[in-house]
């Protein structure tokens, strides 16, 4: 695969709604449409990592510039023809399942596994009972408490960080992660799921 080379990563910067329905196996999602720069730094960590971009037409220049601003100058370039070309050539693709807040509400009493990837301060203001908590910046290194054979509903505050987390977990062999669309904001506004307080 493209990312088997030592110290190389496939970084997909498209919108998460497009990413989840098809992406190159082992790629990491960090979309240009969200908090791109801080999460590149927090998630990729190693500024010497070689980066191959997957982007929409016209996004490459902006992505390379924004990577460079936070010290990631080792961009190998972007995939010619983008994801569409990759898929149309018959190469393997992955997907990530998603559920909206109302769908989560239907399953909430079925003993499902919920993973909260928000910061500690956000969680202190309210969280879902029995949810596990691993802040996004730690998901790559601190996932020992998770079980690869289980399905996890992953949420953040608004739905951007959770997709980053799902892509990292997928690369690590967690094949049943479900992204909760709209995150905790949507859960607290659109459902009657009980919110716990510390």
Region spans (language model):
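Rhodanese-like catalytic fold shared by cysteine-dependent sulfurtransferases
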Residues: 16-198
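C-terminal accessory/connector segments of nucleic-acid motor ATPases
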Residues: 1-6, 15-19
């Amino acid at each position: 695969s493209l990312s088997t080379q030592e110290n190389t990563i496939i970084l997909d910067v498209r919108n998460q709604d497009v990413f989840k329905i098809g992406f190159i196996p082992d790629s990491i999602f960090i979309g240009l449409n969200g908090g791109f720069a801080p999460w590149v730094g927090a998630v990729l960590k190693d500024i010497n990592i070689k980066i191959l971009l997957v982007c929409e037409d016209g996004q490459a220049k902006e992505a390379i510039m924004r990577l460079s601003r936070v010290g990631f100058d080792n961009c190998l370039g972007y995939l010619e023809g983008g994801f569409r070309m990759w898929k149309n050539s018959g190469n393997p693709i992955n997907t990530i399942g998603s559920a909206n807040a109302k769908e989560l509400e239907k399953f909430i009493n079925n003993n499902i596994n919920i993973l909260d990837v928000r910061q500690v301060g956000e969680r202190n203001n309210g969280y879902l009972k029995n949810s596990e908590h691993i802040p996004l910046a730690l998901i790559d290194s601190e996932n020992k408490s998770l079980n690869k054979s289980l399905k996890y509903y992953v949420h953040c505050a608004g739905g951007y960080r959770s997709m980053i987390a799902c892509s990292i977990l997928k690369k690590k062999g967690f094949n049943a992660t479900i992204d909760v669309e709209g995150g905790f904001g949507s859960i607290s506004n659109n459902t009657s799921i009980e919110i716990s307080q510390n």
